[in-house]
Amino acid sequence: MDKDLLISNIKKMKKEQNAVIVAHSYQVDEVQEIADVTGDSLALSQFCASSQADTIVFCGVHFMAESAKLLSPEKTVLLPEINAGCPMADMVTAEALKEAKKKYPHAAVVCYINSSAEVKAECDICCTSSNAEKVIRSIDKKDIIFAPDKNLGSYVAKKVPEKNIIFWEGYCITHHKIKKDAVIESKRLHPDAILLVHPECRPEIQELADFVGSTKQIIDYARNSEHDKFIIGTEMGVLYQLKKENPNKTFYMMSTGLICPNMKKTSLQSVHDALAKRQYEITLDSGIIERASGSLNRMLAVGK
């Protein structure tokens, strides 16, 4: 089926099923083009929580679709590519987190949204890269277990030094592989460019950046900045929105290897098939929904 026919069919089925298509900023361009909303994990969570649609087609990875189901359990949530997972999310399990809670019984537990529903059920509150600092500041306790991303945890620890952050040993394999030498070389090649990186990068990479922020914050920074040249230190899918909003600005990827294979699995065909076959539906145990949705709703109550 050619692209135009796929898009036409998607629009038709979406209307018939009262469905919305949400896409993370790391999705391929053609998927972002047909989405009703694009953004980072926080923006998409907020959208799903308030959506009046009956069906949410979530173009992202598994934990994101689970989060949409947790926030809107009465809705049908479809994940076009059921094997689109997240290695970082797999680096923490509910069982391991339970053991950490026994080791630090007086600590609060914050989990990055990049985690399974079962893990979210064991934590006090969730966060995203957009609101991690605000979430940490909202917690009364001094000791905080932060899972699974140690790089985001390190970033927050510097912002909120009065807290004792207990790091998990997790990381994003795409951001974590950025090396200091590559950053220095990028800055040498583009001396007039501003370096924007994601807090999932290693601390030594964050220190070299002119700005550290989530994908949405990076997009906002580039839009509002007077500068016209930027080096981008996050997954390359963000270039779609950056170039769309800033046609007269120049963006250089820090590395051509900044690709999340799981985010790239979703295609127009798989979005079409998700609607046509009503696949793949996210289902969660009612007990998990009750416990895990609380951590997400507490995050949303804290705000952006």
From Swiss-Prot:
Q: Which GO terms describe its molecular function?
A: 4 iron, 4 sulfur cluster binding; metal ion binding; quinolinate synthetase A activity
Q: Name one GO biological process term.
A: 'de novo' NAD biosynthetic process from L-aspartate
Could you say which EC number(s) this protein's record lists? 2.5.1.72
Q: Where does [4Fe-4S] cluster bind?
A: 86, 172, 260
> What pathway is it annotated to?
Cofactor biosynthesis; NAD(+) biosynthesis; quinolinate from iminoaspartate: step 1/1
Give the cofactor binding note. Answer: Binds 1 [4Fe-4S] cluster per subunit.
The lineage's top-level taxon is Bacteria
Q: Which reaction does it catalyse?
A: iminosuccinate + dihydroxyacetone phosphate = quinolinate + phosphate + 2 H2O + H(+)
Q: Which cofactor does it need?
A: [4Fe-4S] cluster
Enzyme class label:
transferase
- Sequence positions that bind iminosuccinate: 24, 41, 112-114, 129, 198-200, 215
Subcellular localization(s) per the UniProt record: Cytoplasm
InterPro entries, per the entry: NadA, NadA_sf, Quinolinate_synth_type2
Q: Which Gene3D superfamilies match?
A: NadA-like
**What does the UniProt keyword field contain?**
4Fe-4S, Cytoplasm, Iron, Iron-sulfur, Metal-binding, Pyridine nucleotide biosynthesis, Transferase
Q: Which SUPFAM superfamilies does the record cross-reference, listed alphabetically?
A: NadA-like
Q: Can the keyword Transferase be found in this entry's annotation?
A: yes
- GO CC term (a single one): cytoplasm
Q: Fetch the PANTHER family from UniProt.
A: QUINOLINATE SYNTHASE, CHLOROPLASTIC (PTHR30573:SF0), QUINOLINATE SYNTHETASE A (PTHR30573)
Q: Briefly, what is this protein's role? A: Catalyzes the condensation of iminoaspartate with dihydroxyacetone phosphate to form quinolinate.
* Family listed: Belongs to the quinolinate synthase family. Type 2 subfamily.
Instruction: Output this protein's name.
Output: Quinolinate synthase
| Organism this protein belongs to | Ruminiclostridium cellulolyticum (strain ATCC 35319 / DSM 5812 / JCM 6584 / H10)
